[in-house]
UniProtKB/Swiss-Prot annotation:
Keywords: Biological rhythms, Cytoplasm, Developmental protein, Myogenesis, Nucleus, Repressor, Transcription, Transcription regulation, Ubl conjugation
Transmembrane residue ranges: none
PROSITE patterns according to UniProt: BHLH
Ranges in a coiled coil: none
Pfam family, one: HLH
Description of post-translational modifications: Polyubiquitinated; which is favored by Ifi204 and leads to proteasomal degradation.
Gene Ontology cellular-component annotations: cytoplasm; nucleus
Name this polypeptide is given: DNA-binding protein inhibitor ID-3
Oligomer status and interactors: Homodimer, and heterodimer with other HLH proteins. Interacts with CLOCK and BMAL1. Interacts with COPS5 and COPS7A. Interacts with IFI204. Interacts with GATA4 and NKX2-5. Interacts with ANKRD2; both proteins cooperate in myoblast differentiation.
Domain of life of the native organism: Eukaryota
Principal subcellular localisation of the protein: nucleus
């Protein structure tokens, strides 16, 4: 499964919608017309199609209602929360012993006179 960040794309759309809603409520910008609700509807439809693309497990050829898309998004978020809540796997079992120079083969041990060449 490929990890994607759906937050940025939909966040921008939500911010855009929020700014438009505030402008309409304050009476700034365009006068309310039939064009404004259609563009909001297009933005929402774009967000739903984007969610549908980003959430794994949504079949490509099937029609889903907006409620079904949101339910799958919620299920996916809950699944991610469960995975993140699980403890991280620890180091593999077994003793971690430091290697002693006596255990190394003579070729791997650097003598004191050869160490001076390193620095």
């Amino acid at each position: 499964m490929k990890a994607l960040s759906p937050v940025r794309g939909c966040y921008e759309a939500v911010c855009c919608l929020s700014e438009r809603s505030l402008a309409i409520a304050r009476g700034r910008g365009k006068s309310p017309s039939t064009e404004e609700p259609l563009s909001l509807l297009d933005d929402m439809n774009h967000c739903y199609s984007r969610l549908r693309e980003l959430v794994p497990g949504v079949p490509r050829g099937t029609q889903l209602s907006q409620v079904e898309i949101l339910q799958r998004v919620i299920d996916y978020i809950l699944d991610l929360q469960v995975v993140l809540a699980e403890p991280a796997p620890g180091p593999p079992d077994g003793p971690h012993l430091p290697i002693q120079t006596a255990e190394l083969t003579p070729e791997l041990v650097i003598s004191k006179d050869k160490r001076s060449f390193c620095h």
